[in-house]
Curated annotation (Swiss-Prot):
Leucine methyl ester carried by residues: L307
Matching InterPro entries: Calcineurin-like_PHP_ApaH (IPR004843), Metallo-depent_PP-like (IPR029052), PPA2-like (IPR047129), Ser/Thr-sp_prot-phosphatase (IPR006186)
Record-listed E.C. numbers: 3.1.3.16
Domain of life: Eukaryota
Active-site residues annotated for this sequence: H115
Family listed: Belongs to the PPP phosphatase family. PP-4 (PP-X) subfamily.
Source organism of this protein record: Xenopus laevis
The protein, known as: Serine/threonine-protein phosphatase 4 catalytic subunit
Binding site for Mn(2+) 2: D82, N114, H164, H238
Length: 307
């Protein structure tokens, strides 16, 4: 029982945006690893479920997401990666989601995004944040080891395929995804890389991605993939959409974006997708958490003699 009460205390602490001890992070990651190692590369998820896109360390907006979508375990969640980088609270964001995963493994599914990578986090903020908040890179190491265990995709009721980025020219079937050895750093190319980096594009066939990794894929590619795997649609994140969600290719691909006012300056709204037990869809749109609920000190107004 003490293990669960410890975990509940850590969850409460993290919900208040307070750090847990380095030793607690180590133990949490060890428990998470035991759970995640059992999950498939195409993790099965049952409806009803609420599907979420990128969070990017925007902790107070994640709290807003839980406010509008319901808390774990009452709501069953699927997060499609990119928990860290760019926002101010990547540590608290990822550790809260991980603690919820350990506490309620059947009520929250976490899949890997392109930012769940050692290389990317050293550039876009998570590494520096761990160093600043803990005084060493040990916590970053624990977390990035867990990244390697995160599933690459999920399938809801056998009908909705969820992945962070998109499709790969090396992959025609879900079974091919199931055979990938995922327990590694995100490679620079190949099928695992493509799943996390690719984007839909109004084109046919495959195109070169301006991101420098993954591919652009067209409507014909999607039609083929969906038919071959007997699925209705692909749900993904990875691209900022100002309205929070966006349909592509006659509603066969959906982008969901869950970081409102991205980077604290883009002015976009965010969305989550609620699927009921019949896979009926309802989008919940939400805005950034109000400034006064946040931990960032609001900038002092510039004195008028500078204007």
């Amino acid at each position: 029982m003490t293990e669960i009460s410890d975990l509940d205390r850590q969850i409460e602490q993290l919900r208040r945006c307070e750090l847990i001890k380095e030793s607690e992070v180590k133990a949490l990651c060890a428990k998470a690893r035991e759970i995640l190692v059992e999950e498939s590369n195409v993790q099965r998820v049952d409806s009803p479920v609420t599907v979420c896109g990128d969070i990017h360390g925007q902790f107070y907006d994640l709290k807003e997401l839980f406010r509008v979508g319901g808390d774990v375990p009452e709501t069953n969640y699927l997060f499609m990666g990119d928990f860290v980088d760019r926002g101010f609270y990547s540590v608290e964001t990822f550790l809260l989601l991980l603690a919820l995963k350990v506490r309620y493994p059947d009520r929250i599914t976490l899949i890997r995004g392109n930012h769940e990578s050692r290389q990317i986090t050293q550039v876009y903020g998570f590494y520096d944040e761990c160093l600043r908040k803990y005084g060493s890179v040990t916590v970053w190491r624990y977390c990035t080891e867990i990244f390697d265990y995160l599933s690459l995709s999920a399938i809801i009721d056998g009908k909705i395929f969820c992945v962070h980025g998109g499709l790969s020219p090396s992959i025609q079937t879900l079974d091919q995804i199931r055979t990938i050895d995922r327990k590694q750093e995100v490679p620079h190319d190949g099928p695992m890389c493509d799943l996390l980096w690719s984007d839909p594009e109004d084109t046919t066939g495959w195109g070169v991605s301006p991101r420098g990794a993954g591919y652009l894929f067209g409507s014909d590619v999607v039609a083929q993939f969906n038919a071959a795997n007997n699925i209705d649609m692909i749900c993904r994140a990875h691209q900022l959409v100002m309205e929070g969600y966006k349909w592509h290719f006659n509603e066969t691909v959906l982008t969901v974006w869950s970081a409102p006012n991205y980077c604290y300056r883009c002015g976009n709204v965010a969305a989550i997708l609620e699927l009921d037990e019949h896979l009926q869809k309802e989008f919940i749109i939400f805005e950034a958490a109000p400034q006064e609920t946040r931990g960032i000190p609001s900038k002092k107004p510039v004195a008028d003699y500078f204007l």
